[in-house]
From Swiss-Prot:
Lineage of the species this protein comes from: Bacteria, Bacillati, Actinomycetota, Actinomycetes, Mycobacteriales
Gene3D superfamilies for this protein: 2.60.200.20
Phosphothreonine carried by residues: 14
Domain FHA: 68-117
Primary residence: cytoplasm
Keywords from the UniProt entry: Cytoplasm, Phosphoprotein
Protein name, as recorded: Oxoglutarate dehydrogenase inhibitor
Organism name: Corynebacterium jeikeium (strain K411)
Keyword rRNA-binding in annotation: no
Primary gene name: odhI
Length: 144
């Protein structure tokens, strides 16, 4: 017997496979200034990271906390399982309606739009590289 009541249990996992056509749009660079379909449904004040290249391409991570940790440690909010990623690699910090990525002492560094950065305020469409992973930042809020 199971205790299944027919109502799915709420999961804290925020990853899922994203549309393949979105990855192609991001590759072509056509979505840098426009929000792709689905982003308008994000909760207010949140943003989305989509894995563009690397293991688990297409996975997405919701940024909906003040600080979201990314790294190879299994307890990381964003678990990036590859030896090129430090256990505590970077943090995504929400400051008002902006997000900032901050390298927290990683061995291989954190890159924003292919430039090494200790910290950087993110704009819609920015590409963040953490080890072998390339993630695209998508902000659901309206930018001026």
């Amino acid at each position: 017997m199971s205790d299944n009541t027919g109502v799915p249990e709420a999961s804290v996992e925020t990853t899922s496979v994203f549309r393949a056509d979105l990855l192609k749009e991001m590759e072509s660079g056509s979505q840098h200034d426009a929000s792709p379909a689905g982003v308008e449904g994000l909760p207010e004040g949140s943003a989305l990271l989509v894995v563009k290249r690397g293991p688990n391409a297409g996975s997405r991570f919701l940024l909906d906390q003040e600080t979201t940790a990314a790294g190879r440690h299994p307890d990381s909010d964003i678990f990036l399982d590859d030896v090129t990623v430090s256990r505590r690699h970077a943090e995504f910090r929400r400051n008002g309606d902006q997000y900032e990525v901050v390298d927290v002492g990683s061995l291989n560094g954190t890159y924003v739009n292919r430039e090494p950065k200790n910290s950087s305020v993110l704009s819609n469409g920015d590409e963040i590289q953490i080890g072998k992973f390339r993630l695209v930042f998508l902000n659901g809020s309206k930018e001026a």
